[in-house]
A protein has these predicted regions:
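Transmembrane alpha-helical segments and their membrane-interface loop/helix boundaries
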Residues: 1-125, 244-476
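Residue-level signal for transmembrane alpha-helical positions in Major Facilitator Superfamily
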Residues: 4, 139-142, 190, 228, ...
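Helix-loop-helix units of permease transmembrane domains in multi-pass membrane transporters
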Residues: 6-7, 16-17, 144-185, 470-475
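Secretory targeting signals
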Residues: 32-37, 114, 118-137, 179-234, ...
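Long, hydrophobic alpha-helical segments
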Residues: 86-91, 126-152, 156
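Hydrophobic/aromatic residues in alpha-helical transmembrane segments
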Residues: 142-146, 194, 228, 232, ...
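Helix-loop interface residues and adjacent transmembrane-helix termini in multi-pass membrane transporters
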Residues: 153, 239-240
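C-terminal membrane-exit region of the final transmembrane helix in multipass inner-membrane proteins
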Residues: 230, 234, 242, 469-471
Length: 476
């Protein structure tokens, strides 16, 4: 253990003596602080704006005069999605996904179907976030400070002396890895903790137990990633004859993992699981609706059958003899049919996007960057699963609201004044506003089961390599 501590101590001294490393730390520190400041301020400002708009929408909604319930259902309601508390750190798809949905009767406003909106690919390169710096630039820093850690010792003959002194290969690699890892963690994980602390001190209302748990997992996730990068750096340095060769291999590996494989995963996903455009999506729904029937057509087969069944159930011959307003009853059935059809198409579409993104999830077993990126977005609530959950919750709210007004129309509006009778505005003013039910960390991770298994795989792989694998590596 003492020999490992000595190796770690020497590694720290070597890194600190490297002026370029110190300059890079300064540059990265400035970038991290700038990204953190922009992220925190933008997240806070966006949420203030969206909350203000949401209050204005609510005020306009409750200030409506007495109306026909069907008119109210078509008046609509605009819902804004607040940015997650940790989106200041990891933008995810926030910059590409929509932030508001208009809810109205008989119409499901579709999600943004652009590739940008649902992509987990390379579109994030144009954004400067803390997560992007830690995911792509910090590995380069680790490669730079560690590429010669064993290769240079091998080329100048010092390694033979160390091995002759009886230092085991496993301890040597352990010490070098821990030295690079501990230095990187002290600097960059420390920066994460500092920024998170300052952000939550500045905006204490955002710090809930759920957000704290997500923050802790994010810190653990990035810490493990730094260890993987340190471990890979030492292994490649150990297998290289010179430091320059090791650096070349490491840069090629960075390009492969950070640029080529993510883009390849995206393109392969699109090729294997093509998704319809927004126009195609809506056209398919319209075509299926035409096959089901049109509630506005008195001669439509489906709704004629529905009318006959309703009359038979109440033992009457005409809708005028029903104990309720048939128009409201018919609208409720039409809403049910169209909603079921839309949800079936929507679920199929989301399955397509999930299949596209599964390519990157499976590649996480060979690419730790993809593992980190996917879990980082999941943990911070900025991935596709959270956005789709928001869409589904708003759709459920829209359906409940619409059916409530259909029931009012059915039971409280006179059939002879179906289109003109107004109800007291108190009947819709007391409806609860939409409130998004935040999901916990375990829900977020459960939607990334494959990537989570890849995370466990990398940890087990490293543990096994330190236990059994390093004895076979030839350093001399």
């Amino acid at each position: 253990m003492n020999s490992i501590k000595n190796i770690v101590r020497v590694e720290w001294k070597n890194i600190i003596r490297t002026k370029t490393a110190m300059v890079l730390i300064g540059v990265f520190a400035i970038l991290l602080l700038f990204a953190a400041f922009i992220g925190v301020e933008n997240t806070a400002a966006q949420n203030v704006i969206r909350q203000s708009y949401q209050e204005q929408v609510r005020d306009d909604y409750v200030d409506q005069p007495d109306r026909n319930p069907h008119r109210v259902s078509h008046y609509g309601y605009l819902v804004f999605r607040e940015r997650p508390a940790l989106s200041f750190f990891e933008f995810g798809i926030e910059s590409f996904a929509g932030n508001s949905i208009f809810l109205e009767a008989h119409r499901q406003n579709t999600v943004n179907l652009s590739e940008a909106g649902f992509s987990n690919g390379m579109l994030r390169f144009g954004e400067l976030s803390m997560a992007l710096i830690l995911q792509l630039l910090v590995p380069l820093f680790i490669f730079f400070i560690g590429y010669g850690t064993l290769a240079d010792l091998k080329s100048n003959g010092v390694l033979k002396i160390m091995l002759a002194q009886g230092i085991p290969i496993r301890k040597l690699i352990w010490g070098k890895t821990l030295g690079i890892f501990s230095f990187t963690t002290t600097v960059f994980t420390g920066a994460m903790l500092l920024v998170f602390s300052i952000a939550f001190i500045a905006y204490p209302e955002e710090l809930t137990s759920a957000v704290l748990l997500r923050s802790i997992f994010a810190v653990i996730l990035y810490t493990v990633f730094f260890f993987i990068c340190s471990w890979v750096t030492v292994l490649i340095s150990a297998k290289s004859s010179r430091g320059g060769t090791a650096l070349l291999w490491l840069i090629m590996l960075w390009m492969l993992c950070g640029i080529i494989l993510p883009k390849m995963a995206q393109n392969v996903g699109y090729a294997l699981f093509p998704a319809p455009s927004k126009l195609e999506f809506e056209t398919r729904i319209t075509e299926d609706l035409e096959q089901v029937g049109d509630s506005h057509d008195p001669d439509d087969a489906y709704y004629t059958s529905f009318r006959e069944k309703t009359l038979a159930a109440y033992g009457v011959d005409d809708v005028k003899d029903l104990p309720f307003n048939y128009a409201g009853h018919l609208m409720a059935e039409g809403e049910r049919v169209t909603t079921e059809l839309y949800r079936a198409h929507f679920d199929k579409l989301i399955d397509t996007y999930n299949n596209q993104n599964s390519i990157a999830a499976y590649l996480s077993f060979v690419n730790p960057y993809l593992m980190l990126r996917n879990l980082s977005m999941a943990v911070t609530g900025t991935d596709m699963a959270h956005y789709i959950d928001f869409q589904k919750q708003t759709e459920d709210y829209r359906y409940r609201q619409t059916q409530y007004f259909n029931e009012l129309h059915k039971n409280e509006v006179d059939a002879e004044r179906s289109g003109t009778q107004r109800l007291d505005s108190s009947r819709f003013k007391d409806r609860d506003p939409f409130e998004y039910q935040n999901r916990d960390l375990f829900w977020a991770l459960s939607n990334n089961g494959i990537t989570l298994m890849a995370f466990a795989f990398w940890i087990i792989l490293i543990a096994l390599s330190f236990s059994f694998g390093f004895q076979k590596i030839k350093l001399s």
